[in-house]
């Protein structure tokens, strides 16, 4: 009888021990999983580009005042605050356009509102870094703001034809566009960065953009790289003669935002993400904070 009681006690002990061991194993497994679902930015610029506004060549005074305004919002922190609304947790502000009326003193801005976060629409309202700057510039000049939304290819042309005063459309400075407009001083330095899962070591030894590009060139057609739709990252992955990007073997997957792309990467649906450096840092910090 005593032996049976001892055997029962031993069985209970073993049962409790195995249950505890299993629980510890599961917790350890969860911890390991969490380590692999964070995101890291490879701190190497894949591209370098400068954004500026394109002013009517026949309005040198507007060019001068716009350059003064750019210097002002850079120095007093206004530009940084605007950017934070779109790259961090700030609240973007709606910008409204007046109706074009040649009898009024208006600032007529040409844009292509399909380039979030620089310019985009929700309903009849405009949003984006460029659009908020446009509103402040119009206020600074004491003018009423009119926004003319058009195809991207027509933006600089409309200014050269004096249908609009200034082009504000995430414009990279280049010689071809300088035939149509006079560029202001740069207000935004853009570069593309690569985001990878934190357990990926493929790029650990990379020191330059060429090093990263060489690794990306080894991707397969079955691999997928996420980008925010319409951005330089998309051209980098797909290839573009205008941008002198050869393209990558991997398939380009577009998303409405960089956040959606990074989350899809962490879910295992794509391999990497390529987006602008500033949003790359903000997005990974925000997503990793809740992992």
Question: Which role does the model predict for each range below?
Answer:
Residues 51, 61-89, 101-171, 254:
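Extracytoplasmic small-molecule ligand-binding "clamshell" domains
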Residues 34-47, 154-157, 170-180, 235-239, ...:
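A ligand-binding cleft/hinge motif common to bilobed small-molecule-binding domains
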Residues 34-38, 89-126, 209-224:
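Immediate post-signal peptide segment of exported/extracytoplasmic ligand-binding proteins
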Residues 25-29:
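C-terminal motif of bacterial Sec signal peptides marking the signal peptidase cleavage site
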Residues 37-63, 102, 113, 188-196, ...:
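Periplasmic-binding protein-like
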Residues 121, 134-143, 213-221, 228-254, ...:
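Ligand-binding cleft/hinge of the Venus flytrap
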Residues 45-91, 131-140, 197-214, 219-220, ...:
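Extended ligand-binding regions for polar small-molecule ligands
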Residues 37-47, 135, 144-214:
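Acidic, polar ligand-binding/catalytic clefts
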């Amino acid at each position: 009888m005593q032996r049976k009681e001892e055997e029962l006690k031993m069985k209970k002990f073993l049962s409790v021990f195995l249950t505890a061991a299993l629980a510890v194993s599961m917790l350890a497994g969860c911890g390991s999983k969490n380590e692999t679902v964070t995101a890291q930015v490879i701190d190497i610029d894949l591209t370098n580009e400068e954004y500026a506004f394109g002013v009517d060549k026949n309005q040198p005074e507007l060019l001068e005042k716009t350059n003064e305004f750019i210097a002002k919002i850079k120095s007093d922190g206004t530009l940084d605050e605007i950017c934070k609304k779109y790259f961090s947790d700030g609240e973007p502000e709606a910008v409204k356009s007046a109706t074009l009326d040649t009898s009024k003193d208006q600032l007529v801005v040409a844009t292509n509102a399909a380039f979030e976060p620089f310019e985009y629409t929700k309903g009849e309202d405009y949003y984006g870094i460029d659009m908020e700057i446009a509103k402040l510039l119009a206020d600074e000049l004491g003018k009423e703001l009119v926004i003319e939304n058009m195809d991207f290819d027509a933006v600089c042309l409309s200014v050269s034809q004096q249908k609009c005063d200034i082009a504000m459309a995430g414009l990279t400075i280049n010689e071809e566009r300088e035939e149509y407009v006079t560029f202001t001083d740069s207000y935004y330095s853009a570069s593309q960065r690569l985001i990878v899962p934190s357990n990926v070591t493929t790029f650990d030894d990379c020191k330059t953009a060429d090093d990263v590009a060489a690794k990306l060139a080894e991707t397969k057609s079955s691999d997928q790289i996420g980008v925010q739709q319409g951005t330089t990252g998309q051209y980098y992955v797909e290839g573009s003669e205008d941008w002198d990007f050869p393209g990558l073997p991997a398939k380009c997957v577009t998303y409405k935002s960089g956040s959606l792309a990074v989350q899809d990467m962490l879910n295992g649906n794509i391999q990497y993400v390529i987006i602008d450096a500033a949003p790359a840092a903000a997005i990974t910090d925000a997503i990793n904070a809740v992992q």
